[in-house]
Amino acid sequence: MERYDKAALNAADVPPPSFSQNGGSLVSTLKTLLFFTILMIMLPIGLYFSSKVYVFEGTYGMSNRDSYFYAAIVAVVAVHVVLAMFVYVAWNEGSPQWREGKQD
């Protein structure tokens, strides 16, 4: 039977490191993700219907068929704008040390 060193057994009793430093960063990241998720859903749908009714049919007097087509283009452009904004915010949200490389 092996005898275990008491110091080695006490080393296992050390609590795991606290991740509270990253907790705020995680909450901030989730808030950003939730914001852009809602924006990704609401903005294109809202722009589709509002541009169809008020801009293309109301202002320009287009037919129902043509207004569907152009409103869809507006919605697709809105999706791409939201995606570009998300990538920009996500890129700049990281710590400057991570982007520049670790400097000791």
UniProtKB/Swiss-Prot annotation:
According to the record, the segments passing through the membrane are: 29-49, 69-89
Where is this protein found?
A: Endoplasmic reticulum membrane; Endoplasmic reticulum-Golgi intermediate compartment membrane; Cytoplasmic vesicle, COPII-coated vesicle membrane
Its keywords, alphabetically, are: Cytoplasmic vesicle, Endoplasmic reticulum, Membrane, Transmembrane, Transmembrane helix
Keyword Metal-binding assigned: no
Task: Print the organism lineage.
Answer: Eukaryota, Metazoa, Chordata, Craniata, Vertebrata
Similarity comment: family membership: Belongs to the VMA21 family.
GO terms for biological process, alphabetical? vacuolar proton-transporting V-type ATPase complex assembly
Q: What is this protein called?
A: Vacuolar ATPase assembly integral membrane protein vma21
Q: Which gene encodes it?
A: vma21
